[in-house]
Swiss-Prot record:
Gene this chain is encoded by: murG
Alphabetized UniProt keyword annotations: Cell cycle, Cell division, Cell inner membrane, Cell membrane, Cell shape, Cell wall biogenesis/degradation, Glycosyltransferase, Membrane, Peptidoglycan synthesis, Transferase
EC number(s) stated in the UniProt entry for this protein: 2.4.1.227
Protein name: UDP-N-acetylglucosamine--N-acetylmuramyl-(pentapeptide) pyrophosphoryl-undecaprenol N-acetylglucosamine transferase
HAMAP family: MurG
Group of enzyme by EC: transferase
MF terms (GO), sorted A to Z: UDP-N-acetyl-D-glucosamine:N-acetylmuramoyl-L-alanyl-D-glutamyl-meso-2,6-diaminopimelyl-D-alanyl-D-alanine-diphosphoundecaprenol 4-beta-N-acetylglucosaminlytransferase activity; undecaprenyldiphospho-muramoylpentapeptide beta-N-acetylglucosaminyltransferase activity
């Protein structure tokens, strides 16, 4: 058969899954074999098989904030899932496991530790997740996207993103010749962000017509009708879609993005070279989205606007103060933060650990 076998452990959110898929592509391009350890009834169960990757699942859910009964059952659940993960590792003769985060990462990593299989972890957020914090004690390599997530030397590799985003022309080239209204992209994730859907149309309505940017607004699943109705009722022109299938073109054409501050979003903004008005999701575990946003803001690549301070009046004030020159400067600063070879760096670290 040739090549080594790697088990990727990632699940729960796209922020864990899509960076892992980029690493899977890099490993397979080098002639290696990849299997995936995920959770049952999960996002990864819907996504991963589409990429031709063998998916194995464990029956495990998160423990933070859940009821006392589930917490009391945790030792039993952990024992059962670790045993099942050991069976999967033996069955596929896994030579290295790579943990990206999510509920499944800890039992999979513990199983690898007990079997003497090397562990590599990659942390996508500025604040390390619970599973990765535990596994870092046993990992042969600790890799991370933000400088302060861990302190392990040589571990800063950035977040893996799609090559077609990293390969976009530099901001100065994209912005050349642009005139007229700013073009602003609004994305709140695949489910949308109700606060953005509500506030952005109201903010634009407060601006004079000739000062309003051109808007391309992703509503999120099931919210297109209500979003378009809000824009129409306020007399504001906007192009609204439920879900953007071609994010590369959306990034290419935008002058600025209004968005949340998930790890994958930050990685794509820096890879593309785009400034942003960042409204972190306030209920994220350990408030990691605020820490992610500060990474861009400290580089003068955008503004952090806490959701508690997000009003139509405040957003209108910010939008009214923007011009293309400022957006270009933010975009150029964002691009300096990019680490475009992240997927290959993670893959090569894992290959070295499996040797």
């Amino acid at each position: 058969m040739g090549g080594k076998t790697f088990m990727l452990m990632a699940g729960g959110t796209g922020g864990h899954i899509f960076p892992a898929l980029a690493v899977a592509d890099s490993l397979r391009a080098r002639g290696h074999h990849v299997i995936w350890l995920g959770s049952k009834d999960s996002m990864e169960e819907r996504i991963v098989p589409q990429y031709g990757i063998r998916l194995e699942t464990l029956a495990i859910k998160g423990v933070r904030g859940n009821g006392i009964k589930r917490k009391l059952m945790l030792p039993v659940t952990l024992y059962q899932t670790v045993r099942e993960a050991q069976r999967i590792i033996r069955k596929h003769r896994v030579e290295c496991v790579i943990g990206f985060g999510g509920f499944v990462t800890f039992p999979g990593g513990l199983a690898a530790k007990l079997l003497g299989v090397p562990i590599v972890i990659h942390e996508q957020n500025a604040v390390a997740g619970l599973s990765n914090r535990h596994l870092s004690r046993w990992a042969k390599r600790v890799l991370y996207a933000f400088p302060k997530a861990f302190s392990h030397e040589g571990g800063l590799v950035g977040n893996p993103v799609r090559a077609d985003i990293s390969n976009l022309p530099v901001p100065a080239e994209r912005f050349q010749g642009r005139e007229g209204r700013l073009k602003i992209l609004v994305v709140g994730g695949s489910l949308g962000a109700d606060v953005l859907n509500k506030t952005v149309p109201q903010a634009l309505a407060l601006l004079p017509d000739d000062a309003r940017p051109q808007m391309y607004h992703q509503s999120g699943r099931g919210k297109l009708g209500s979003l378009q109705a809000d824009y129409d009722a306020l007399g504001v022109k906007a192009e609204c879609v439920e879900f953007i299938t071609d994010m590369v073109s959306a990034y290419r054409d935008a002058d600025l993005v209004i968005c949340r501050a998930g790890a994958l979003t930050i990685a794509e903004l820096t890879a593309a070279g785009l400034g942003a008005l960042l409204v972190p999701y306030p209920h994220a575990v350990d408030d990691h989205q605020t820490a992610n946003a500060r990474f861009m803001v400290q580089a003068e690549a955008g503004l952090l606007l806490p959701q508690t301070q997000l009003t139509a009046e405040k957003l209108a004030e910010i939008l009214g103060s923007l011009n293309r020159e400022k957006c270009l400067k933010w975009a150029e600063n964002a691009r300096t933060l990019a680490l475009p070879h992240s997927a290959d760096d993670v893959a090569e670290a894992a290959i070295a650990c499996a040797a």
